[in-house]
Amino acid sequence: MGQLHFITKLLDIKDTNIQIIDVVNRDSHKEIIAKLDYDAPSCPDCGSLMKKYDFQKPSKIPYLETTGMPSRILLRKRRFKCYHCSKMMVAETPLVKKNHQIPRIINQKIAQKLIEKISMTDIAHQLAISTSTVIRKLNDFHFEHDFSRLPKIMSWDEYAFTKGKMSFIAQDFDNLNIITVLEGRTQAVIRNHFLRYDRAVRCQVKIITMDMFSPYYDLAKQLFPCAKIVLDRFHIIQHLSRAMSRFRVQIMNQFERKSHEYKAIKRYWKLIQQDSRKLSDKRFYRPTFRMHLTNKEILDKILSYSEDLKHHYQIYQLLLFHFQNKDPEKFFGLIEDNLKQVHPLFQTVFKTFLKNKEKIVNALQLHYSNAKLEATNNLIKLIKRNGFGFRNFENFKKRIFIALNIKKERTKFVLSQA
């Protein structure tokens, strides 16, 4: 009996009316045989004292794993009968709600598991319950928007919810809490949401970081008149890099496909894209050139094949240098000086930069970026991938808020050294 008492404590069963009778090891799980019994209460209908009648058929209550195996409690509940009005009543316990089969501790565990980036099917499998039970627990979560405040620094981005459809997300830059997740990213959807905030609240926003997505620019200015727009530095460099890559392909296609020049430009394309200050000076044997060369020597040979390629490469590297040094005057000065001389691929990018000069200057002068929100988007993609996609946007939205806005406390175990 002493061992069974400790089993009760180990399982965290605090109801003293539950008595564990035996523990049976099955092939796939453990069965904890128990009974619920206490003194007869008064009849809820007539007030007479009820009497003990018999025990119900055992309720199969799923429980947490013990020693790495799924467990369930076979709980026989006492039934009471009023011999005055024939009222029947079943004994109740705080272990599980009345007329329910899932215990409270399992519901708590479901809530904890929903914070993790795993699918609801996996949660159901781990806890030996149905997926429908997990979804019902997910639906118990309700997140209400606080329309009385907005953060001073906000990040905007989009992510793919379904194939061919992008959704909008806004995040607090400082504490990383999700402000909102909207099913669409159209101006009407975003405007309708943020107009629910008072103008005084919207004027509290001072900085908005975002990608180079032009429909956001005017919308952000209309909704947040006091906010500065800061473009993400990664996407600015990405525009430059893509222009350089496309121009390199055009130069490469001017040579015969079997020529040495074509093969060299095609094979060592990364050296052209890379920051010249980060080129390795280690010498290796290069089969394309049949000699030992450093990356710098390979690059010099490739640039010697075309004066146009060399000229645009030098402009590209100077722009990278001024951008990384955060010198907007020299960066835009170089763009304005070479706007008419460069290839149309570069002209398109340069005109885009000049059109958004103020926002790019903000990106160079301020340390804010969209990096934190991009990391959040990776977690959202992980949730979506682990769940093999979501058909219901509201369920997906709740998983995002639960996983990213609810902070999970960590217990650190310190292992003693022998």
Predicted regions and their residues:
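Short, conserved DNA-binding cores of transcription-related domains
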Residues: 1-87, 91-93
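Short secondary-structure boundary/capping segments
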Residues: 170-171, 223-227, 244-249
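Acidic, glycine-enriched active-site microenvironments
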Residues: 99-110, 121, 180, 321-324, ...
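Acidic/histidine-rich catalytic cores and adjacent linkers
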Residues: 40, 45, 51, 138, ...
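Active-site beta-loop-alpha junctions of metal-dependent nucleic acid enzymes
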Residues: 99-101, 179-201, 207
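Short, positively charged, Gly/Tyr-enriched micro-motifs
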Residues: 47, 60-154, 158-165, 202-205, ...
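Short alpha-helix plus adjacent loop in nuclease-associated cores
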Residues: 236-257
